[in-house]
């Protein structure tokens, strides 16, 4: 199905979670409050402020925050998190609703080397539970994911394979290195 013009809620209902290059988190809310807002069924802001979190929801949030290394920052406002931590918060907000497919745009953009490595580890952990499509220009990061890679050029598929195959592919070299 084409989701190009679909509403965000309809996309989520189809089991698709999207993380954009710039993390969509609420700066003035704590890490935990951002997660509360992402709970399925709490999309309306008024509902969020009036509802109490059930024990099982709280446990699930804490489990996910521990998994993404943010449990100790659960009371920290998002504006005080590093860029990498904000990326992890955005990813954790997505996985809270257990989507079948995660579309992750530029997860390594602007991260430190350590944050990049930890983000790759997180995505590798998640790939057993979700189908993940990563859009990324950092080839070292892509190499860490050790997955099938599809190279696009001018809107069309240029090549597919593992990183070893693609770095030796003449079409890829021509398109991206201009030889």
Residue ranges: model-predicted function:
Residues 49-73, 121:
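Conserved ABC ATPase "signature" region
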Residues 102-106:
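Catalytic Walker B motif of ABC-type/P-loop ATPase nucleotide-binding domains
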Residues 1-14, 53, 79:
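ABC ATPase NBD Q-loop/coupling interface
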Residues 4-6, 64-82:
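Conserved ABC nucleotide-binding domain
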Residues 116-128:
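Helical segment within the ABC ATPase nucleotide-binding domain
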Residues 142-144:
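A short, surface-exposed alpha-helical micro-motif characterized by mixed small hydrophobic
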